[in-house]
């Protein structure tokens, strides 16, 4: 089965001094949650044949962040419960511990370095032409290295609490499952997911026409 949680939260919501936090949060989802300490998510699911990278992964774009568990065996109800518990923790239970944040700064820097190739430079050069005068031309998903290196721990926690909440989330489960049972399990788990703190209204950024 496939278990996805889609957050309507991407780099487009960042202020300049936050550029990179949406992507950083995505990485932190695999570095300790309420019910899965440390690398517990990866360790548990790899123990049942669900591989990190191919089947346990996530991505961040300008408009969304999506986390997924793919090809999860559904032969045992306990596995289904664990997969839904991971979705719950990604929704509201990231620990965001200082030592894990600092360790991940280096991972993101390396991702930034290895991605600084010709295609990325072309992307950055072309975007202002594709989206003239728009926030979409300005924002870079992987972020600003100065922000990545120096943001305060609470800056990431505040961003998480501000934007991650039930009104910005969708749970998708596809596979050989009992739909009614899964729906009831999701409702029970999400009953205690808190509303967003310091709730921000999600801005809608337009894309202007160009001559082409």
Where are these regions (language model features)?
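Non-catalytic beta-strand/loop surface segments
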Residues: 1-13, 35-76, 100, 114-168, ...
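Active-site alpha-helix of zinc metalloproteases
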Residues: 15, 19, 171
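Active-site SXXK
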Residues: 19-33
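Divalent metal-coordination and catalytic microenvironments
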Residues: 23, 67, 87, 108, ...
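Generic, well-ordered alpha-helical scaffold segments in large soluble proteins
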Residues: 28, 86, 90, 111, ...
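M16/insulysin-pitrilysin zinc metalloprotease superfamily fold
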Residues: 32-35, 69-104
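Extracytoplasmic/secreted cell-surface and envelope-processing proteins
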Residues: 37-38, 179-183
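Helix N-cap motif at beta-to-alpha junctions
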Residues: 73-76, 176-180
């Amino acid at each position: 089965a496939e278990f996805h949680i889609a957050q309507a939260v991407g780099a487009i919501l960042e202020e300049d001094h936050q550029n990179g936090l949406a992507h950083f949060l995505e990485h932190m989802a695999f570095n300790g949650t309420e019910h899965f300490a440390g690398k517990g998510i990866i360790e548990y699911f790899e123990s049942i044949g669900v591989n990190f990278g191919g089947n346990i992964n996530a991505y961040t774009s300008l408009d969304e962040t999506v986390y997924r568990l793919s090809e999860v065996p559904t032969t045992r109800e306990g596995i289904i419960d664990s997969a839904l518990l991971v979705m719950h923790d990604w929704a509201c239970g990231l620990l965001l511990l200082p030592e894990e944040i600092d360790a991940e700064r280096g991972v993101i820097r390396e991702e930034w370095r290895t991605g600084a190739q010709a295609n990325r430079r072309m992307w950055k050069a072309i975007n202002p032409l594709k989206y003239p005068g728009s926030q979409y031309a300005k924002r870079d998903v992987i972020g600003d290295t100065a922000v990545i290196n120096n943001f305060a721990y609470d800056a990431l926690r505040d961003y998480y609490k501000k934007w991650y909440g039930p009104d910005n989330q969708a749970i998708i489960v596809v596979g050989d499952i009992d739909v009614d049972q899964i729906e009831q399990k999701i409702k029970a788990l999400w009953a205690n997911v808190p509303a967003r703190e310091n709730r921000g209204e999600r801005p809608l950024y337009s894309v202007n026409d160009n001559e082409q």
